[in-house]
From Swiss-Prot:
Residue positions of the active site: C64 (cysteine persulfide intermediate)
Function: Transferase that catalyzes the transfer of sulfur from thiosulfate to thiophilic acceptors such as cyanide or dithiols. May function in a CysM-independent thiosulfate assimilation pathway by catalyzing the conversion of thiosulfate to sulfite, which can then be used for L-cysteine biosynthesis.
Protein name according to UniProt: Thiosulfate sulfurtransferase GlpE
Organism: Pseudomonas entomophila (strain L48)
Domain Rhodanese: 16-104
Length: 109
């Protein structure tokens, strides 16, 4: 894949069940208030370590608030060598309304 793909929450749920990595690029307070279960919080301070330690071929799902900022972040990850990147349409807001039981709370790390 030379570009990221936009996917629905339903497609993201299926990929997550198969072991896809989920990264949440929202601010730390929003992440702490609620995020996709198993998601890693990713920001300007943690992205370098994330990239260095990541499997660049693993499916990687990027989520933001509404599915807009995640597209830029997904494109950035593709530019860093990731080959299987997806932006979740509707962001965490749509995910939470679709799958309220698939969310967690708490700070990163």
């Amino acid at each position: 894949m030379s570009e990221f793909k936009r996917i629905s929450p339903e497609q993201a749920l299926a990929l997550r069940a198969e072991g896809a990595v989920v990264v949440d690029i929202r601010d730390p307070q929003a992440y702490a208030a609620g995020h996709i279960t198993g998601a890693t919080h990713l920001d300007n301070h943690s992205v370098a370590d994330f990239i260095r330690n990541a499997d660049l071929d693993a499916p990687t799902l990027v989520v933001c608030y509404h599915g807009n900022s995640s597209q830029s972040a997904a494109a950035y990850l593709v530019g860093q060598g990731f080959s299987n990147v997806y932006s979740i349409d509707g962001g965490f807001e749509l995910w939470r309304s679709t799958y309220p039981g698939e969310t967690a709370q708490g700070n990163a790390e």
